[in-house]
């Protein structure tokens, strides 16, 4: 086992990465190794997808499957080894079908890629795990060095984050052939184990630029189906009655659940990155979408154990449900998996609803505590002139984009301290689950404009980028000249690709934490600092002083 893709990876003087019987996320060595095997199979599939496009062959089954299966290897998504192997077998079957299509056009069609003809050696998981050793990401570290390995992983993990967003967009009916062609090209190239530093750096920026397009179509999918988010108050306390909790990012699953629970007497609560759903008109119209439950994903083993109803996980993040003994009432959807947990293959939630009706639910309603969400792209753009007016009248000094992933590391309290230290004449724009560090606190307003503005899920960084570009255009300056600072927390691969997106767009002087990614060497961090001004957090006082004086 070798996995260094998330923020909580093991770090020792000898090197970084989880390489024992189990990773810090709870992933076993078996599952981790089989995920490496799956990635190799997907690289072979992409190699043939690239070749097929040369013949004008576009296989939509391949295009929809490849990013979805890659998403299953993202942190805290799928811990179920047999399902990972199932994805690998499906990848190989799709590859062979695509290969046959190519050979039907050109009998001499071939692909020069080491993954292009990969076959699984056995049905036995142990044998497959031994085969997977051939594809361990750091297998040639001694030959290529830590810097090349780090850049490879930056590209691989960044592309994995983009694949997750591609799947979210695809679920909502969004497809862009140019994006899929670019995805396959990059995925196939990474399967050749590239070792050119400049080419890898260029690839990382290409991934960032591609992901900006992905976030654009995801935004289009969400807003076309569910309307543009508008500021909405959400209760974060319990309401009496039977209940279901839904977590993850998939708004379509939430919509289907709301439709199927309507009139059943079962209330629905959002958790984690589902919180922004309350801002969408077509979702909040359901009166039994009563509120948001819990805090950051890392607290779920305590909070889920206390929730008196079933739980549905639609995407990341799931962690071991046996610890809180709620594994008999947690359900997984789509690419999510945990051994022994019931999985919903389709969009029928009747079994979940039946379980909710058999459980006690919340016995009484707590005193409401309301927070505000729903500052989506359209709302943010509508406030652009107000922001400029406040800046011109010196009522608004600075905007801090304070967002990203949450996690268990104690140093993450930095983000709470930073938020509460932001001066009263400054505004906090937040997104993603890192907001749970401070989103239930009171921040007041500046002439009626809330000082805490929740822009949505992690992918809604797109809205923040569009706002920044709009402000820069209206002020006749560059984005880096705005009174705007980005202080980002990271945990997994979606955050990595958001960072690559920002860097590829030329955004500079981003501050990240709580630690640097374990796969980035001191040399690589120095390069990113020199090129983009990217740096790690220090202390709240020092960072605040520096950012306000920039």
Swiss-Prot record:
- Which key words tag this protein in UniProt? 2Fe-2S, Cytoplasm, Iron, Iron-sulfur, Metal-binding, Oxidoreductase
- Give the record's GO biological process terms: response to hydrogen peroxide
Does the record's keyword annotation contain Oxidoreductase? yes
Give the UniProt entry's GO cellular component terms: cytoplasm
GO molecular function, a single term: metal ion binding
PTM sites of type Cysteine persulfide: 405
Which InterPro entries does this UniProt record tie to the protein? HCP/CODH (IPR004137), Hydroxylam_reduct (IPR010048), Prismane-like_a/b-sand (IPR016099), Prismane-like_sf (IPR011254), Prismane_a-bundle (IPR016100)
- Classification via Pfam families: Prismane
Q: Tell where it localizes.
A: Cytoplasm
Q: Which cofactor does it need?
A: [2Fe-2S] cluster; hybrid [4Fe-2O-2S] cluster
- How does the cofactor bind to this protein, according to its record? Binds 1 [2Fe-2S] cluster. Binds 1 hybrid [4Fe-2O-2S] cluster.
Report residues binding hybrid [4Fe-2O-2S] cluster: 249, 273, 317, 405, 433, 458, 492, 494
Q: Does the keyword Iron-sulfur apply?
A: yes
> Where is [2Fe-2S] cluster bound in this sequence?
3, 6, 18, 25
Give the catalysed reaction(s), semicolon-separated: A + NH4(+) + H2O = hydroxylamine + AH2 + H(+)
Q: What is its EC number?
A: 1.7.99.1
Q: Per the similarity annotation, which family is this?
A: Belongs to the HCP family.
**HAMAP family (alphabetical):** Hydroxylam_reduct
Give the protein's biological function.
Catalyzes the reduction of hydroxylamine to form NH(3) and H(2)O.
For this entry, the protein name equals Hydroxylamine reductase
Tell me the gene name.
hcp
